[in-house]
Amino acid sequence: MIEVIFLGTGGIKPTPERNVPSIAIKIGGEIILFDVGEGTLRQMEIARISPMKIKRVFITHFHGDHYLGLPALIQTMSLWKRKDPLHIYGPEGSSTFLQNLLNSGYFAPSFDILVHEISGKSRLKFKEYEVWAFEVSHGVPALGYVFKEKDKRGNFNLKKIKELGLEPGPWMKELERQKIIEINGKIVRLLEVTGPKKRGAKVVYSGDTEPCDEVIEFSRRGTLLIHEATYVNEEDRKDSYHTTIEEACEIWKKSKARKLVLFHRSPRYSFKEYKEKALSICPQAIIPRDFDRIAIEGAGDVLFKIR
């Protein structure tokens, strides 16, 4: 199971009601951050998320509301004597922007900070998950991300085991490790005695973007699409590099992702006003507040939890 935690759901600037963008994904004992707007450290304290559990941070682009929370996060990690390296991933220019941040004050981190500039073709593989990057359209180098939980093996099939003349026992753990073993003179393969694989969750985060086909393509068969919907309607739009609620809903329908989350709300709207208008346009959408959580069991059940 993974858990998606919304640390900041607004865009552009904080309001008394919500902070700027940051999303945490919890898998096992690890926390992965996507965007770190100013004030994210305080949001983490409220959500009871330890900075020490963060191994990787993914930045969509370098507008302030998406990355200015990094200095406070890094300095707190150092204050707590962190030794493990921190990996930060982002688009073209990441190394320069982050080095400038680290040089802006009397501060030296207690751990290595490894910056990875990635492109829209990057596919990063880790122990329990993968992260894919794709290019979006925001007027500056900008990425969206796919978080893909690795598929799990199917359950042991007792009927198949007995058909091989075997009984359940300790050998099953050895088979899990080795994938193929010899038992009682028989070669047994893990795939022969287990059911179909359980598909892992697929969470897609658009970052800031105007409508673009890449989001649709990378969201196909997704479990959850988190798409920016800065403006309620076309009349409110201030620029051409953001998305309206109606546009985000159309993108979701084309992608056939299971669930849609509308994110990065303009500070001009109260939560109540935005939610009412959003649900009148796209009744199936999830509109989270800061600190709301979504639990996902594989590619199946999606449980939205109000804080």
Swiss-Prot record:
Signal peptide: none annotated. Its EC number is 3.1.26.11. Binds 2 Zn(2+) ions. Homodimer. SUPFAM superfamilies: Metallo-hydrolase/oxidoreductase. It holds the Pfam family Lactamase_B. Zn(2+) 1 binds at residues 61, 63, 138, 208. It is an enzyme of class 3 (hydrolase). The gene is rnz. One of its GO terms (molecular function) is 3'-tRNA processing endoribonuclease activity. The active site is at residue 65. Zn(2+) 2 binds at residues 65-66, 208, 264. Its cofactor is Zn(2+). The keyword Nucleotide-binding does not apply. It catalyses: Endonucleolytic cleavage of RNA, removing extra 3' nucleotides from tRNA precursor, generating 3' termini of tRNAs. A 3'-hydroxy group is left at the tRNA terminus and a 5'-phosphoryl group is left at the trailer molecule. InterPro entries: Metallo-B-lactamas (IPR001279), RibonucZ/Hydroxyglut_hydro (IPR036866), RNase_Z/BN (IPR013471). It comes from the Archaea. This is Ribonuclease Z. Belongs to the RNase Z family. Keywords: Endonuclease, Hydrolase, Metal-binding, Nuclease, tRNA processing, Zinc. Zinc phosphodiesterase, which displays some tRNA 3'-processing endonuclease activity. Probably involved in tRNA maturation, by removing a 3'-trailer from precursor tRNA.
